[in-house]
């Protein structure tokens, strides 16, 4: 069976450093506490408990704070802790060893700095995770969310500036989606992306491996956030993915019939656990408690510091590339020393050496072996002790990079230089042979063998000592020389000799600087003034702009509300434009202050960056450094005269500026539109007009709403309606002959003019009784009827056939009467 390890897996340097911190404290006096789980791994935690550490929660520590003594030790876990715990520990003056991961510390520091400088914080992470609980306690104004859906629901104030940050162990792909959303939708959100590099590469490594193997094993504590994320990623790509804490949880049946197995592990998983998993898979599982680093270190000590045997003096008789041979009185054979130990000697010189034994059996000739190096090592011990006691600086050389740090040699004394004390960058590749300066941090001797000395070196302590000296020499208001080390979105990180300083973007210039990288680069030498000093954190905050006079100091004397002035546009944003009215003094023209009449304003249509424009001051508060400007205030508000200019029934011409399916908008004055609904285009029966933008039209004002600044107009109101025409033509008594348009159960409809029908009720359709009107009339029949009623309110005209018939009948009767009357007279 082939077992393939992920390219990146297991202990990250943050976890390793936390474990190294605890291991270095095992022999210290006093009670030893670890705040929370040192790392999310039961085996590591249990190992620490066996070594004398007691695990306590934050609540337990705070409750028992009064019982802590000055020689007690508290180790802060890799995930960090809350601000209140830090402050309480500082008050108690106990020995605190902060093993917080540097990525977590970096995020915490950036959030704290940003919050102090007025930024609101947006933080993505699991609010119940100990890392998140600790980090967010350092900010007052903060919103927490866990998903893209929650991010979209956040309340973002466009007048505020935000810092977006994240939990270090978050899924990098998820945060990339969040970053993209905020970049595309908000210009006032600064993104601080510090997902742990170890987390990101481990997630990428498991993605690459999961698709290449038949079974994927993820090793780690089930409570570990980064371990669970590795499992989730693997499970999506390979359904045969299993999360186990140790070899005891491993079910060998899952490997039945499988040939290729992949293994990865969380950042808190020991190498021993991973190896035990591998051994069980191969069927050769057995426990191993080898400490790789310690063995390597011990072997090196044995190589250079064997038990002393005998010192002798001899004359160098010959030297070759590998060995030199000495004549030592009293010895039965030549004494052989490695030539590289006698670089400062030549043939004929007398030299003192230490006898170490006999040459190997396979040598052609037997020699007594000796060492000059070990003599020199003993002579240099005073320098090592002096460095330990008085912190004197030693020249040293890196001999090898090992897990957790480096093997270093100073005055022939090898020792261990932990990563946390090395000041050597992780990205630095060629470190073997690197010359450095160190001090001795610690010496441990074996009581049974005083030659077995374990030395811990430190580079960091040299810097801290120099920093302490330099920090003591600083004062608020002092001008210092700095070198830019990092250009961030919200400030400049600088070096002041050995000290670190920070210049927030708001302290760089009195002028607006949206992108510091346009003005500064790494390596720039600048001057700045010290504005605050934090002795506890060795933090130095500086200002460049305070080297010059505050331009706001004279604003009250130079400007007042209602002044019309010229300025330069410095920034165009969706919600307005910033205009500089003098160097270092800016005001905002809000989007609502560009036009009296336009409801939808595109700021970029009005102004461009670096353009000189005229503005009016609408609000000014120099003490708060607030200035509001307006462009529309330069001209009169046309709505103030709208009641007179656009009174109801006013006929006015304008141009079509927008065509919608439901109507048109007509500009009747600069920036003032009237809306004409499609139902007001034409009367029934008239041709429906078509409009294009730019068409000139005439309309009549039908509605004026000054409160909501709305005007409605009508095109058809310019002409008489069909009803008005009908009223003029069809008065009561008018007789018409028209075709029947519709036959209904209750009467007849005839079209008088296009769009206006007349109605003949059934009872008016004939003088005779009509049982079924459809039997008597059909659509298309021409009938003669008389208008009997015109109702203006309902706009209805009623007619009668019956009245015509009765009148005709009466006329015929009169004619007959007249006829017979005439005949009788003649007779």
UniProtKB/Swiss-Prot annotation:
What job does this protein perform? Answer: Catalyzes the conversion of 1-hydroxy-2-methyl-2-(E)-butenyl 4-diphosphate (HMBPP) into a mixture of isopentenyl diphosphate (IPP) and dimethylallyl diphosphate (DMAPP). Acts in the terminal step of the DOXP/MEP pathway for isoprenoid precursor biosynthesis.
Quote the record's binding site residues for dimethylallyl diphosphate: 40, 79, 129, 224-226, 268
The record's listing under SUPFAM superfamilies reads: Nucleic acid-binding proteins
Q: Name the positions where (2E)-4-hydroxy-3-methylbut-2-enyl diphosphate binds.
A: 40, 79, 129, 168, 224-226, 268
S1 motif domain ranges (all copies): 477-545, 562-632, 649-716, 733-802
One of its GO biological process terms is: dimethylallyl diphosphate biosynthetic process
Annotated stretches, region: 4-hydroxy-3-methylbut-2-enyl diphosphate reductase: 1-284
The record's cofactor note says: Binds 1 [4Fe-4S] cluster per subunit.
Organism, scientific name: Fusobacterium nucleatum subsp. nucleatum (strain ATCC 25586 / DSM 15643 / BCRC 10681 / CIP 101130 / JCM 8532 / KCTC 2640 / LMG 13131 / VPI 4355)
Is-annotated flag, keyword 4Fe-4S? yes
Q: Name one GO cellular component term.
A: cytosol
**What EC numbers are recorded for this enzyme?**
1.17.7.4
Q: Does the keyword 4Fe-4S apply?
A: yes
Q: What class of enzyme is it?
A: oxidoreductase
List, from the UniProt record, the residues annotated as the active site of this protein.
131
Q: Which gene encodes it?
A: ispH
- Protein name (record): 4-hydroxy-3-methylbut-2-enyl diphosphate reductase
- Give the keywords, sorted: 4Fe-4S, Iron, Iron-sulfur, Isoprene biosynthesis, Metal-binding, Oxidoreductase
- From the UniProt record, give the pathway where this protein acts: Isoprenoid biosynthesis; dimethylallyl diphosphate biosynthesis; dimethylallyl diphosphate from (2E)-4-hydroxy-3-methylbutenyl diphosphate: step 1/1; Isoprenoid biosynthesis; isopentenyl diphosphate biosynthesis via DXP pathway; isopentenyl diphosphate from 1-deoxy-D-xylulose 5-phosphate: step 6/6
Positions bound to isopentenyl diphosphate = 40, 79, 129, 224-226, 268
Q: Which reaction does it catalyse?
A: isopentenyl diphosphate + 2 oxidized [2Fe-2S]-[ferredoxin] + H2O = (2E)-4-hydroxy-3-methylbut-2-enyl diphosphate + 2 reduced [2Fe-2S]-[ferredoxin] + 2 H(+); dimethylallyl diphosphate + 2 oxidized [2Fe-2S]-[ferredoxin] + H2O = (2E)-4-hydroxy-3-methylbut-2-enyl diphosphate + 2 reduced [2Fe-2S]-[ferredoxin] + 2 H(+)
Its family remark reads: In the N-terminal section; belongs to the IspH family.
Q: Where does [4Fe-4S] cluster bind?
A: 12, 101, 196
Cofactors demanded by this protein? [4Fe-4S] cluster
Q: Which Gene3D superfamilies match?
A: 3.40.50.11270, 4-hydroxy-3-methylbut-2-enyl diphosphate reductase, catalytic domain, Nucleic acid-binding proteins
Q: Please name the GO terms that the record assigns under molecular function.
A: 4 iron, 4 sulfur cluster binding; 4-hydroxy-3-methylbut-2-enyl diphosphate reductase activity; metal ion binding; nucleic acid binding
């Amino acid at each position: 069976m082939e077992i393939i390890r992920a390219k990146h897996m297991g202990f990250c340097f943050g976890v390793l450093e936390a474990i190294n911190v605890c291991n270095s404290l095992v022999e210290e006096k006093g009670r030893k506490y670890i705040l929370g789980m040192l790392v999310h791994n039961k085996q590591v935690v249990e190992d620490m408990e066996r070594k004398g550490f007691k695990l306590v929660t934050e609540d337990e520590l705070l409750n028992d704070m009064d019982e802590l003594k000055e020689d007690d030790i508290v180790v802060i876990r890799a995930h960090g802790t809350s601000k209140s715990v830090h402050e309480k520990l500082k008050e108690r003056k106990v020995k605190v060893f902060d093993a917080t991961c540097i990525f977590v510390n970096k995020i915490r520091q950036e959030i704290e700095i940003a919050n102090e400088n007025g930024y609101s914080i947006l933080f993505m992470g699991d609010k119940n995770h100990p890392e998140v609980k600790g980090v967010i306690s350092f900010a007052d104004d903060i919103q927490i969310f866990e998903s893209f859906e929650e991010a979209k629901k956040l309340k973002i104030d466009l007048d505020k500036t935000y810092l977006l940050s994240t939990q270090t162990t978050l899924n990098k792909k998820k945060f990339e989606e969040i970053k993209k959303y905020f970049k595309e939708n908000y210009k006032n959100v600064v993104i601080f992306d510090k997902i742990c590099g170890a987390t990101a590469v481990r997630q990428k490594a498991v993605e690459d491996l999961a698709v290449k193997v038949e079974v994927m094993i993820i090793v780690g504590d089930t409570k570990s956030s980064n371990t669970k994320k590795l499992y989730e990623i693997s499970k999506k790509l390979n359904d045969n993915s299993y999360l186990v804490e140790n070899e005891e949880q491993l079910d060998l049946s899952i490997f039945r019939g499988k040939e290729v197995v992949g293994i990865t592990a969380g950042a808190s998983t020991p190498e021993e656990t991973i190896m035990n998993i591998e051994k069980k898979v191969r069927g050769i599982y057995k426990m191993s408690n080898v400490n790789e680093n310690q063995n390597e270190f011990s072997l090196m000590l044995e190589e250079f510091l064997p038990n002393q045997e005998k010192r002798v003096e001899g004359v160098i008789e010959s030297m070759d590339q590998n060995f030199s041979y000495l004549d030592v009185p009293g010895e039965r054979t030549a004494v052989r020393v490695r030539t590289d130990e006698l670089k400062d000697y030549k043939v004929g010189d007398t030299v003192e050496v230490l006898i170490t034994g006999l040459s190997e059996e396979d040598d052609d000739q037997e020699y007594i072996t000796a060492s000059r190096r070990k003599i020199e090592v003993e002579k240099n011990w005073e320098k090592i002790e002096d460095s330990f006691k008085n912190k004197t600086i030693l020249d040293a050389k890196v001999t090898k990079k090992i897990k957790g740090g480096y093997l270093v040699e100073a005055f022939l004394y090898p020792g261990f230089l932990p990563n946390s004390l090395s000041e050597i960058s992780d990205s630095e590749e060629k470190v073997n042979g690197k010359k450095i300066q160190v001090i001795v941090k610690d010496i441990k001797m074996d009581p049974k063998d005083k030659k077995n000395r374990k030395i811990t070196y430190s580079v960091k302590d040299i810097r801290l000592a120099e920093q302490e000296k330099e920090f003591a020499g600083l004062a608020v208001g002092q001008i210092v020389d700095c070198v830019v080390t990092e250009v961030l979105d919200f400030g400049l990180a600088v070096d002041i000799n050995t000290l670190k300083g920070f210049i927030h973007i708001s302290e760089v210039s009195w002028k607006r600087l949206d992108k510091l990288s346009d003005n500064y680069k790494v390596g720039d030498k600048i001057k700045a003034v010290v504005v605050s000093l934090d002795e506890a954190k060795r933090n130095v905050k500086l200002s460049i702009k305070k080297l010059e006079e505050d331009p706001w100091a004279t604003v009250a004397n130079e400007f007042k509300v209602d002044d019309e002035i010229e300025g330069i546009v410095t920034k165009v944003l969706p919600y307005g434009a910033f205009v500089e009215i003098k160097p270092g003094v800016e005001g905002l023209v809000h989007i609502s202050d560009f036009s009296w009449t336009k409801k939808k304003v595109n700021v970029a249509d009005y102004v461009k960056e670096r353009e000189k424009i005229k503005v009016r001051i609408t609000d000014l508060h120099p003490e708060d450094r607030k200035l509001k400007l307006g462009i529309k205030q330069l001209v009169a508000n046309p709505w103030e005269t709208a009641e007179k200019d656009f009174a109801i029934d006013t006929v006015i011409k304008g141009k079509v500026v927008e065509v919608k399916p439901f109507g048109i908008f007509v500009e009747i004055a600069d920036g003032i539109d009237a809306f004409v609904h499609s139902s007001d285009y034409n009367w029934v029966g008239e041709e429906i007009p078509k409009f294009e933008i730019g068409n000139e039209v005439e309309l009549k004002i039908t509605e004026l709403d000054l409160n909501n600044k709305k005007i409605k107009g009508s095109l058809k109101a310019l002409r008489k309606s069909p009803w008005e025409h009908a009223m003029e033509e069809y008065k009561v008594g008018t007789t018409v002959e028209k075709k029947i348009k519709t036959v209904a159960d209750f009467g007849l409809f005839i079209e008088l003019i296009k769009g206006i029908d007349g109605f003949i009720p059934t009872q008016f359709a004939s003088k005779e009784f009509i049982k079924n009107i459809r039997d008597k009339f059909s659509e298309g029949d021409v009938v003669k009827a008389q208008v009997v009623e015109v109702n203006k309110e309902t706009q209805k005209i009623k007619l009668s056939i019956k009245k015509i018939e009765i009148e005709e009948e009466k006329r015929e009767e009169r004619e007959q009467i007249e006829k017979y009357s005439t005949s009788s007279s003649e007779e």
